[in-house]
């Protein structure tokens, strides 16, 4: 079976052998690395390689501001909070608890193109109704609670201005600025063609940016989806693609590219092993990898259902086998953590 990225790379080579003015955008950096390897294998000529970007890197380039760390964002958010009309300001240590949640909310507001003032006004009105009572006077606690919702649009505006003044932004703000800048970006790069490869679910800003590029006939998009999931209206895996097909004007004239029929046409082999305890599971993984050829190892993914298995599996991987690990793990599970405990 030909891998998805190899298939798409080969298709692009045939359609556009000149990569000097192309940008390939992927959901992750890792996908770009694999695509680059397939490009080298499938192309025998000496060429200028295209530019490979993750969607985050592409958005950052469009936004023309730098990503801000969570710590910096929280500090600027607290400064903005101190400038609002709330009388009894909380200390920074108390603020961090709910400030992190507000930061996440602001991030989602910008990523999905929501108007903060309208959103928080609606929420404030709902809170007013939920705390309505026959008594004319509200308690001081209720007044403070309602005041908090009232100042959130102001907090959002102050916070956004502070970030832009420093040329930085949280992820949502990067998406917002990228969407604003996309038209000028295409004008500045009149000869560049864009390929979006391996996407499925998109947030509102990503969807609008890609649709604009497609509407200007400046690129193509290749979806990582199987026909089986697309045609089954009850299957969650095809939900977003069915939504795109229904809502995107682009699909009124064009068919989705990249959609395959691998799921039903490819023979599947499933081996089930009954193994007790975490260490035994990790050891079994090591034994199976020992039986694989180098080529099989390069095309193998180990998906763990529990992050606690990560350390045992790392120790069970055969010597000399290079593993690319992308998985979060608590610092408490690192041996060095004992030094600072």
Predicted features along the sequence, with ranges:
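Nucleic acid-machinery interaction/catalytic patches
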Residues: 1-341
């Amino acid at each position: 079976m030909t891998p998805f990225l190899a298939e798409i790379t080969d298709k692009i080579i045939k359609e556009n052998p000149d990569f000097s003015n192309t940008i390939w955008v992927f959901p992750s950096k890792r996908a770009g690395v694999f695509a680059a390897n397939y490009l080298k294998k499938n192309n025998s000529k000496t060429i200028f390689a295209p530019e490979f970007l993750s969607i985050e890197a592409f958005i950052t380039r469009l936004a023309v501001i730098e990503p801000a760390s969570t710590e910096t964002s929280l500090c600027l958010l607290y400064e903005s909070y101190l400038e609002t009309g709330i009388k009894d300001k909380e200390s920074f240590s108390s603020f961090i608890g709910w400030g992190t949640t507000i930061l996440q909310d602001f991030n989602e507001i910008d990523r999905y193109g929501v108007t903060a003032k309208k959103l928080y006004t609606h929420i404030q009105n709902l809170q007013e109704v939920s705390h309505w009572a026959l008594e004319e006077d509200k308690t001081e606690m209720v007044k403070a609670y309602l005041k908090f919702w009232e100042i959130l649009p102001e907090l959002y505006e102050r916070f956004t201005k502070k970030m832009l003044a420093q040329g930085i932004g949280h992820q949502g703000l990067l998406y917002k600025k990228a969407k604003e800048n996309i038209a000028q970006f295409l004008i500045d790069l009149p000869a560049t063609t864009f390929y979006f490869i391996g996407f499925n679910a998109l947030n509102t800003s990503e969807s609008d940016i890609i649709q604009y590029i497609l509407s200007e006939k400046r690129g193509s998009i290749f979806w990582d989806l199987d026909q089986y999931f697309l045609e089954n209206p009850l299957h969650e895996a095809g939900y977003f693609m069915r939504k795109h097909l229904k809502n995107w004007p682009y699909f009124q004239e064009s068919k989705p590219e990249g959609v395959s029929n691998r799921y039903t046409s490819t023979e599947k082999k499933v081996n089930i092993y009954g193994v007790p305890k975490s260490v035994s599971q990790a050891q079994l993984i090591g034994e199976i990898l020992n039986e694989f050829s180098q080529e099989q190892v390069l095309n193998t993914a180990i998906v763990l259902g529990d992050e606690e298995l990560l350390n045992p599996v790392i120790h069970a991987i055969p010597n000399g086998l290079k593993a690319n690990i992308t998985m979060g793990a608590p610092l408490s599970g690192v041996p060095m953590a004992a030094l600072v405990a």
